[in-house]
Regions:
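Rossmann-fold dinucleotide-binding core
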Residues: 52, 86-175, 181
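Active-site-proximal catalytic alpha-helix in oxidoreductases
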Residues: 169-197, 201-213
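Residues at the starts of beta-strands that form the adenosine-phosphate
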Residues: 3, 82, 103
């Protein structure tokens, strides 16, 4: 197995994970999954000083929280530990400003859609990917395929198909374009992705937004 620790700022979510674990539903072709996990609130991280340092840190916060989240966890990472931006947007530079570029990788969530619907409960809205449609793409900033990138890809493949990419920045801009065509439109209309696709008017707007991006 793999020793995983979740660290979150939402007290209700931390408490639910501690007492009930995590439940992932709606996984087409894979059923539902429930598993106990270790969860810490951000106010509890000081206790990590007595433990083995982290070998891999996944930064999975909103872009505006990237820098402080990295600063918070950096003291508890191994000297050779790496930091993976598992986020939308381009946040690798913010992470590198804290720990240095040599320790930073990026992971684009290409074809995996999910939402946290309640504390400790995640609904997945996309099927598992495969070699024709990768769910995740991880890469180094310099574009080389490295042993650590391959190791992390194998770990992430427990959640979805994962490919090591030599074009991280291309993956990032592709995802940004995808988000630009739909996220703002969804916020303005209150419609989900499926409803936007089904609306002829929204489809036209989405195409024009993608063209602008």
């Amino acid at each position: 197995g793999v020793d995983v620790t979740f660290i979150d700022a939402w007290p209700d979510n931390v408490q639910a994970m501690r007492t009930q674990g995590i439940t992932v539903t709606g996984m087409k072709g894979a059923g539902s999954v429930h598993t106990p996990v270790r969860a810490l609130h951000i106010s509890d991280v000081s206790q990590l000083v007595r433990e083995h340092p982290f070998d891999i840190v996944f930064i999975a916060v909103k872009s505006y929280d990237t820098r402080w989240a990295t600063q918070l966890i950096a003291p508890f990472a191994a000297p050779t530990g790496c930091f993976v931006s598992l986020q939308n947007g381009i946040n690798e530079e913010a992470i590198a400003s804290v720990v240095g570029w040599a320790r930073v990788l990026g992971c684009s969530v290409s074809a995996l859609a999910a939402e946290l619907t309640a504390p400790g409960t995640i609904v997945r809205n996309s099927p598992l990917g495969d070699e024709k449609k990768w769910g995740l793409r991880i890469g180094e900033a310099h574009g080389q395929i490295t042993p650590r990138a391959e190791t992390i890809a194998r770990l992430l493949s427990h959640s979805d198909s994962c490919k090591v990419t030599t074009n991280l920045w291309g993956e990032r801009w592709t995802k940004l374009t995808m988000n630009a065509r739909g996220n703002g439109l969804s916020a303005c209309t209150g419609m989900g992705s499926k409803a936007l696709i089904e609306s002829a008017t929204c489809r036209r707007l989405s195409i024009r937004l993608a063209g602008e991006a």
